[in-house]
Design a protein with these regions (language model features):
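Juxtamembrane regions of bacterial inner-membrane/periplasmic proteins
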Residues: 2-216
């Protein structure tokens, strides 16, 4: 490349870099802050709103069975089952589990299909709170960035939020509503086997029934 061409390329490259930096800055500045949820509970979530919009679009009644409870009123059996199943390194990572992500990428490359399993509890919470069911690369980037931000709330608060907004059936949200709907008892009273059945619903909460986990 001649000197005049190199000199002409420098301003163009600088402009491109500045544009990219500005784009990233706007991207991160416009991300929602988790700070309001440090001491306050959400009044709704993106997932709940998406489900409501879906119901209205199909002329069905909007269902929202939801009751908030503190983490201390959610069975330790359910807490442990969810962490072990959904995010075994929950208390070790900072929102993104690099080990699981690398394993998921390798598996996807092997089977030519992107599967579930790399999303941490923090990422799933970010998706439920703010992103809904959108599927795109930009959504995954936002999900990861929001998961890192959520980590500032602390692990116990993240787990409390997650267990209170997770979907556990058609219009059923949170551990308390799920426990009362499926087992007619409070979330605090769940037995180990009941906690395991609820945990098994999380990957596909609407089609699965904890009373008939095999579909029979």
């Amino acid at each position: 490349m001649s000197k005049p061409i190199r000199k002409a390329a420098v301003p163009a490259l600088a402009a491109a870099l500045l544009t990219a930096c500005a784009g990233f800055a706007v991207f991160f500045v416009t991300l929602p802050s988790p700070e309001p949820f440090r001491h306050q509970n959400p009044a709704t979530t993106a997932l709940m709103d998406a489900r409501a919009a879906e119901a209205k679009a199909h002329h069905r009644p909007v269902k929202r069975n939801w009751k908030w409870v503190p983490l201390s009123r959610i069975s330790p059996w359910l807490q442990k089952a969810v962490v072990n199943s959904e995010d075994a390194r929950f208390f070790e990572h900072d929102g993104i589990d690099i080990v699981e992500t690398e394993a998921a990428i390798s598996k996807a490359a092997e089977h030519h299909k992107l599967g579930r399993g790399a999303s941490t509890i923090s990422q799933q919470l970010a998706k439920n709170l703010w992103l809904g069911e959108e599927r795109s690369l930009s959504r995954k980037v936002r999900e990861a960035a929001l998961a890192r931000r959520l980590e500032t709330l602390g692990k116990e608060r993240i787990l409390e939020l997650y267990l209170n907004v997770a979907e556990w059936g058609d219009g059923i949200y949170g551990a308390e509503a799920a426990s009362r709907y499926w087992f007619h008892k409070s979330a605090a009273s769940l037995l180990p086997e009941e906690a395991a059945l609820l945990t098994a619903m999380l990957p596909a909460p609407r089609p699965r029934n904890p009373k008939h986990p095999n579909g029979h």
